[in-house]
UniProtKB/Swiss-Prot annotation:
Midgut. The active site is at H81 (charge relay system), D125 (charge relay system), S221 (charge relay system). PANTHER family: GH13245P2-RELATED (PTHR24276:SF97), POLYSERASE-RELATED (PTHR24276). Its EC number is 3.4.21.4. This is Trypsin 5G1. It is found in: Secreted, Extracellular space. It comes from Aedes aegypti. Major function may be to aid in digestion of the blood meal. Disulfide bonds join C66-C82, C190-C206, C217-C241. InterPro entries: Peptidase_S1, Peptidase_S1_PA, Peptidase_S1_PA_chymotrypsin, Peptidase_S1A, Trypsin_dom, TRYPSIN_HIS, TRYPSIN_SER. Keywords: Digestion, Disulfide bond, Hydrolase, Protease, Secreted, Serine protease, Signal, Zymogen.
Length: 266
């Protein structure tokens, strides 16, 4: 119980202290300024045992390019822009703090991208990956909880994002799993911030500090945004990485619970 209290206290202060502590797109002319494939900026190294649902997605015989979240023994959720329906030769690594070694390496049997995924607006940025083999659960490999349908994310809620992406700091390796705490931003505030880019939809949730400094970045896309071991969002897009005035934008998992159940039974 003491450890739980200490972790919760540390989490609160991580969000309260804020930033002081610490690919091209053919249909969007401004896509290079935005990052559609998430990395943790301003975060800290984290053992996979603290985020045992974290998944690394790669092509068979190639390197990590997106993150994901383990939902069950056979299902992983990632971003729609990370994997297209019908795509083959994908694999996931689960249960390792390194994206290139350790843990369980399992091939993807089938990619189910959300049928309403929009490449222009990045709306419905979800994909469910069915695995060829059953995952063996352990301290370093366990599923994340799914939220209730349309569950709200209250402004200021302290959320954790994790992945192996670009840290924007040459002294910090992105080979090792990293995480950062970021507060949820109101839908109204986020929509206003991104109005010149078309705004955000009800399938999106935003998180980050007004002053910037902590965020996901290139390479983290598809990875988890969690609160209380529940998958709140999927790393999706944003303007730059950890830019002041531009919170990270995540695909809101609670908005597609019916689809998740229809496809995976979860």
């Amino acid at each position: 119980m003491t450890r739980i209290i200490l972790i919760l206290t540390a989490t609160f202060f991580a969000c309260a202290l804020g930033a002081s502590t610490g690919g091209s797109h053919p249909l969007r002319p401004w896509w290079n300024a935005l990052r559609s494939s998430g990395r943790i900026v301003g975060g800290f190294e984290v053992p996979v045992e603290e985020v045992p649902f974290q998944v690394s997605l790669s092509g068979v015989g190639s390197s990590h390019f997106c993150g994901g979240s383990l939902l069950s023994e056979r299902w992983v959720m990632t971003a729609g822009h990370c994997a297209a329906s019908g795509q083959t030769n994908l694999q996931v690594r689960i249960g390792s703090s390194q994206h290139a070694s350790g843990g369980q390496l399992i091939k993807v049997k089938k990619v189910n991208r959300h049928p309403k995924y929009d490449e222009v607006t990045t709306d419905y940025d979800f994909a469910l990956l069915e695995l060829e083999e059953t995952v063996t659960f352990s301290d370093s490999c366990a599923p994340v909880k799914l939220p209730q349908k349309d569950a709200p994310v209250n402004e200021g809620t302290c959320l954790q994002v994790s992945g192996w992406g670009n840290t924007q700091n040459p002294s910090e390796s992105s080979e090792v799993l990293r995480a950062a705490y970021v507060p949820a931003v109101s839908q109204k505030e986020c929509h206003k911030a991104y109005l010149s880019f078309g705004g955000v939809t009800d399938r999106m949730v935003c998180a980050g500090f007004k002053e910037g400094g902590k965020d996901s970045c290139q390479g983290d896309s598809g990875g988890p945004l969690v609160h209380d071991n529940t998958l709140v969002g999927v790393v999706s897009w944003g303007y730059g990485c950890a830019q002041a005035g531009y919170p990270g934008v995540y695909a809101r998992v609670a908005s597609v619970r019916d689809w998740v159940k229809e496809v995976s039974g979860l």
